[in-house]
Amino acid sequence: MARLRLLLRSARLLGLVALGLGLAAWVSLRERLPGADVTPLRQRLTRWWLARLCAALPFEVRVSGEAPRQPMLWVANHVSWTDIPLLGALAPLTFLSKAEVRAWPLAGWLAEKAGTLFIRRGSGDSRLINQRLAEQLHRGRNLLIFPEGTTTNGESLRTFHGRLMASALEAGVAVQPVAISYRRDGVPDAQAPFIGDDDLLSHLGRLLRGERGSVHIQLLEPIPSQGLDRAELARQAQQAGRLALF
């Protein structure tokens, strides 16, 4: 049964990847037209495609709360690469990712064409990075970051680093805390976390072979940034996530 499940889910996923490559190539061609602004089109297609990707992943998804209507800096705990499509299907989001993801076969190219902003960890140029992030927020775009800086097994919450929170202060927007919890058979899901020496294909294979798990996404009360510094903003966002998860 596990083998059949893997084959059927893999076939569906490969079809989606082929569709995504076609959509990304089309957007790339549109980008080359003089004066073309493909950002709205890219965001619509990205959200549409991510919703289909989520449907192909072996998760039952439950969402609590409402997505904000105003542009905000979304901050979430980070368990797996699957966090990105799950959140990206809820609202038009600009993603922030480590530079290494750009080198991933197919997935890196798709991420780039979806408008992902890549940063090199440890580059030391945090001011320039925050300027790039604030520019996205000033343009009315939601931005998603994972302030823990790495993935966890979902059973704990690491410190939220305030370095990238400065973009919300500079743009004068609120922070949208998000709590993501993966469960299987009533306990934390051991298959969902993408941690340690995991590689994308091996992790995906484990997910596709297994039974369906569940994901609970909580869109928590937004945190106004006015009057706060980045450390306090990070502390409040982390506290909101901890209370929701544990």
For each feature predicted by the language model, list its residue ranges.
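N-terminal membrane-anchoring alpha-helices
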Residues: M1-E60
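Residue-level preference for the first positions of well-ordered beta-strands
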Residues: P71-L73, G140-F146, H216
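Generic beta-sheet signal
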Residues: K98, I119, F146, V178-I180
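Catalytic-site beta-strand/loop segments enriched in glycine and acidic/polar residues
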Residues: Q136-M165
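Catalytic core of membrane glycerolipid acyltransferases/transacylases, capturing the structured
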Residues: G20, A24-P34, V38-P40, A55-A56, ...
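A cross-family acyltransferase "interaction/gating" segment
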Residues: L106-W109, G122, E155-E232, Q236
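A membrane-cytosol interface segment of integral membrane proteins
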Residues: T116-L137, N142
